[in-house]
Curated annotation (Swiss-Prot):
InterPro entries the UniProt entry points to: Lysidine-tRNA-synth_C, Rossmann-like_a/b/a_fold, TilS/TtcA_N, tRNA_Ile_lys_synt, tRNA_Ile_lys_synt_N, tRNA_Ile_lys_synt_subst-bd
This protein's record includes keyword Transcription: no
Binding site for ATP: 33-38
Segment forming the signal sequence: none
Species this chain originates from: Pseudomonas syringae pv. tomato (strain ATCC BAA-871 / DC3000)
Domain of life: Bacteria
Protein's UniProt name: tRNA(Ile)-lysidine synthase
SUPFAM superfamilies per record: Adenine nucleotide alpha hydrolases-like, MesJ substrate recognition domain-like, PheT/TilS domain
Amino acid sequence: MTTSTPNGHDLPARLLQALAPWRTASTWYVGFSGGLDSTVLLHLLAELAKRANLPALHAIHVHHGLQAIADAWPEHCRQVCQALGVAFESVRVKVEPGASVEQAARQARYAAFTERLGEGDVLLTGQHRDDQAETLLFRLLRGAGVRGLAAMPEQRRLGRGHLARPLLGVSRVELESYARRQGLRWVEDPSNDDQQFSRNFLRSQVLPLLTSIWPHATASLARTAGHLGEAQQLLDELAAQDVANAQATTPFSWLGLPVLNLGPIARLSGARQRNVMRHWLAPLTRLPDSDHWAGWEALRDAAQDARPLWRLADGALHRAQGCIWWLPAGWEQACSEAVNWADPRAPLDLPENGQVSLEGEAPLGDLSVRYRQGAEVMHLSGRGRRDLKRLLNEQAVPAFLRGRWPLLYRDDELLAVANLPGLDGSPNERWRLRWVAPTGDQSLS
């Protein structure tokens, strides 16, 4: 949204311009706290809806239950929406205790928003230019990288829909001016005055001091955040190219585990390696700061016959056969519980390890699915008895995958190893053992 004069007279036109990409959405949800920012946003939208063909408006108030005074806010918000003719919903959430009450409340709030967004819906929130400047300062003091210093994007994916912040180019002074001219009422959150919260200190003490010396400080800081956002976009585009150049095809692609060729990545500069790895791993795990990437270098530079891994918050990165593999935390745990297969005509659900089935005529006898314990031996037609470890080596099954690989037994006889050619069924091909591995959205303890 372009900036303008501080009186805010042109806010409706500027807002309509900022929302142009979202005019075809089915519903515009408005995050409505009852404070100044969201009150002005909702009023502007309701007024615009009288003369423009806009998506349906639906206000959502999230009650965090953190202070007694907030109990009156849902009713205030309901009355405001009733007067504006806007659909209203109040949602009470539970804020999980943690080191940061602000962060926990934000997570609970956005979880509630995400739950309500349908495909193509848009959530509109009222963050403004001063909020953007505050966010940049806060993250700068925490040592954030380019992505963090880009502060709040104007739009991003949120659940099945999108989040848009159409007021990021508007100052708080403009919002206050508009609210007074329109005679709007809003609630004041007393926690915003609590100096124990770092952002409140920046808002009430640091930014006013900066603007007293540099009147355009907030506009300059917000503009810098925009420049950094553009720089991050370029870094993302470069990383996407590097990921594409490192795509790997393995015999085990059906497992659905993220895999890249190490060679093309290792040939990049150190900074570019970290950029592509951040891009690839960001949807999969929380990442360390820039001072804690020694694990990546150790994995990258380990000897060819080593089994290096880089353990991260939500899983681990492994290396095998010239590739790097991402394993979620659940995959790190070997399975040990044997499962009896009473009716091999039906698929068998394995505890936290997907499902196996038999294609063709099932072998006779008492069947069960087990996992590697060591020293297993398998009889192969024309080859005699062979150590399972050697057979898995021949099939190039990475060692870190073997602990979850289903083995079919009849009594104590190893009959088959799921999905591995030559090991997955009977010599006469009357049956095959098939395994559908657990996917990322299945529960893995």
